[in-house]
Amino acid sequence: MTARALHYVFKVANRAKTIDFFTNVLNMKVLRHEEFEKGCEATCNGPYNGRWSKTMIGYGSEDEHFVLEITYNYPIHKYELGNDYRAIVIDSDQLFEKVEKINHRKSGCGRLAVKDPDGHEFKIGKADQSPKVLRVQVNVGDLEKSKKYWNETLGMPIVEEKSSRIRMSYGDGQCELEIVKSQDKIDRKTGFGRIAFSYPEDKLESLQDKIKSANGTIINELTTLETPGKADVQVVILADPDEHEICFVGDEGFRALSKIDDKAESELKEQIKKDDSEKWI
């Protein structure tokens, strides 16, 4: 498959604290920010119908970097994390030295682990390079079943395979997906995330048909999503055997949508300042 790893979606309870963590601890930058008055037709913001926002944040343009999508539902101020998400791996000597000076734990692989305000873990390793998201790690219940889905059904090549974990990627230089065998049953709870990939627009329907033929799970069938003042995109939302959510979005539309917005950070700060949603509860 000709796919491109794009981003991982986090639902967050406190937008201000979250943005502070990603910009001041992990040195990321706000790339674009969008506000929506009603829930996403492809459940991009989770199973919620109210007002929400999307903030893309990362180390560079979405054409060249795997980034994060920060989803904030105005009426929701608490999520419960499950054991589906494991960590995101970022390597950079500069970032490693910075994290060494703050509260962290040492992971088994020698990286430094830190958590965002919602409890999502990030593992920071050493590398003579600018910070780059290398890998998304998720837990799975049945490694072989998960491998078959990602490698055979979704056509993601295997980079490295071990007895308890498998690394895969759609291409050199792309962010990898690492599936890790869990000893516990996977429970996604309310804080579950979603990983996104781009795919040629004219092949999205055939991908959907392939998933149907394989009796795979389709959360949202192929649909067009509108973003006020920006490009429309086509998406289909799938789920793997452990219900990890997967978005495939048309590459052409997404490249038009995902241009860096120089006004995004100031717009985000203004929306945070005006946010009185805690009073709604």
Swiss-Prot record:
Gene3D superfamilies: 2,3-Dihydroxybiphenyl 1,2-Dioxygenase, domain 1 (3.10.180.10). InterPro entries: GLOD4 (IPR043193), GLOD4_C (IPR043194), Glyas_Bleomycin-R_OHBP_Dase (IPR029068), Glyas_Fos-R_dOase_dom (IPR004360), VOC (IPR037523). It holds the Pfam family GLOD4_C. It comes from the Eukaryota. Residues 4-127, 132-251 form the VOC domain. Keywords: Repeat. The keyword Transmembrane helix does not apply. One of its GO terms (biological process) is determination of adult lifespan. Expressed in the following tissues in both larvae and adults: pharynx, pharyngeal-intestinal valve, intestine, anal sphincter, vulval muscle, seam cells and the nervous system. PANTHER family: GLYOXALASE DOMAIN-CONTAINING PROTEIN 4. Thought to act as a glyoxalase. May remove methylglyoxal from mitochondrial proteins. Has roles in reducing oxidative stress and increasing lifespan. Belongs to the glyoxalase I family. This is Glyoxalase 1.
